[in-house]
Amino acid sequence: MSYRTGSCSRSQMRFLGIAAIAAALTWTTVSPNADEAAGMPRGADIRTMCGTKPTVLALADGFGGNTWRKTALAEMKDEASKCPNIKRLLYADAAGDLAKANSDINSLVAQGANILIIYPDFGDATLPAIRAAHEAGVVVVPYISQLSGNAGVDFDANVYANVNAGAKKWVEWMNNYIKEGTLLYFSGVAGNGFSTTVMDNLKRELAPYPKLKLLSDQFIVTNWATADAEKATAGVIAKYGKLDVFITDFGPVALGIIKGFQQAGLKVPANAGVASNNELNCVWMEAKAKGQAWPYMTLEGTTTIVRYALRRGMAIYQGTQDPDPLQIDTYVFADSFGGIDPKCDKSAPLDADLSGFLTPEQLSSVFKQ
């Protein structure tokens, strides 16, 4: 699944390689103000990396037609505004079409991009086009997903979300607060590499905690779609009867699971997740107001990873230094046991991500697009 694809079709569902998920996760309270996001490190100051060479910056999205992608683009524009020598910003949206994604990369190179940031929704299928852009002298930085290519050969750097840290924090939370019970991980398309990697990490992290028991050594297939997640939940209830924790990597999946338990007249289990959305968080806040909330923890901040990608690209192109790592961690956006409520904005789109560094005014502009 790519972070926040629009219609969640299989061809579009390439999850970060994420993710989303995301070297040190901080467990501090998140301020409600974007410019004070206390739980999330901002990273290095790009102004030390701007250099002096005039720069044409480009972003290529494999699938850009949703609020998450628009938010990430706004995060990049905000970061780029700190370097006055970034003279132009080019953007291309392949709308879920692999052939167009490849041609977009070629086109952005032809238009004079010096730095090309790429969200590789199609994974290694776009690697030949990415390599060609690198060989043409463009500084190429794929972000979110970890590709199989090599820096200096296929691209200049790959800035990606640290999935290992996410699994570790989930398990720490479950051990600290749930303590014992049955678990299942609900994820995407059958056989996809991201979900398999997360599942392997979960099993490894859970090994020291026998009281936390995975009911299956395979993830539950949902195709990253709400309706499929609800159907899968009905099957889980029929097979296992009881579940204490469900683990998710996409907000719409969590919504389907919640609906599945509610339709069955059952208590919603605890949820440890990443990549929630405004709808899920508003549903949880409404349940809390009624005294019906379930234990909930989610890791966020994925829209800001593009800022790290831009900084790395700028440092390479300008010959300056970027001290930040290539693996970027998410942070705790909500923790019902830690007293951290998620942000809910009824005026924002259902699929909005409110966990980044944009001000409310900047987010409002994004939502009006």
Put a short name on every predicted segment.
Residues 35-55, 194, 205, 301, ...:
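Hinge/cleft segment of the Venus flytrap/periplasmic-binding protein
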Residues 128-165, 280-283:
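Flexible loop/hinge segments that line or gate small-molecule binding clefts
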Residues 59, 108, 112-121, 139-143, ...:
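Periplasmic-binding protein-like
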Residues 41-44, 101, 157-183, 197, ...:
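Hydrophobic alpha-helical segments within soluble ligand-binding/sensing domains
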Residues 57-65, 73-78, 165-212, 216-219, ...:
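An alpha-beta-alpha
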Residues 82-94, 184-185, 206-226, 268:
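Short beta-strand elements in bilobed, periplasmic/extracellular small-molecule ligand-binding domains
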Residues 36-75, 79, 83, 90-103, ...:
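Extracytoplasmic "Venus flytrap"
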Residues 118-135, 202, 222-283:
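Hydrophobic alpha-helical
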